[in-house]
Design a protein with these regions (language model features):
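Intrinsically disordered, low-complexity, mixed-charge
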Residues: 1-101
Length: 101
């Protein structure tokens, strides 16, 4: 672990379970990601979950994962947030953060 680990660019996919559809979760997720300066995307899945990918500094991504795991949108009830495909990047692949359909 180096001094600059917090500024290392990382990418991770997520899936949020619980009462997360029909409560504007994707909109609030996009807004939060943009506040943090993250790149990536989010969408509703056919399984009733929210899925997406976030990229940014390790600190930014950890902040977003905390939001996805504990806060969410008003009216949401998060059961859990699963992460997968964590990787370090030389640079972000995404410019901005979008809602996919």
């Amino acid at each position: 672990m180096g001094v600059d680990d917090a500024h290392q660019i990382v990418s991770v996919e997520f899936e949020v379970y619980g009462h997360v559809q029909g409560v504007y979760f994707t909109k609030y997720c996009r807004d939060r990601a943009m506040e943090l300066g993250l790149g990536g995307w989010v969408k509703n899945s056919k399984r009733g979950t929210i899925v997406g990918k976030v990229q940014g500094t390790k600190d930014q991504v950890e902040n977003m994962v905390n939001w996805l795991s504990r806060t969410g949108s008003p009216g949401s009830k998060i059961e859990r947030c699963e992460l997968r495909d964590f990787e370090y990047l030389a640079r972000q692949d995404f410019r901005g953060f979008s809602i996919r359909f």
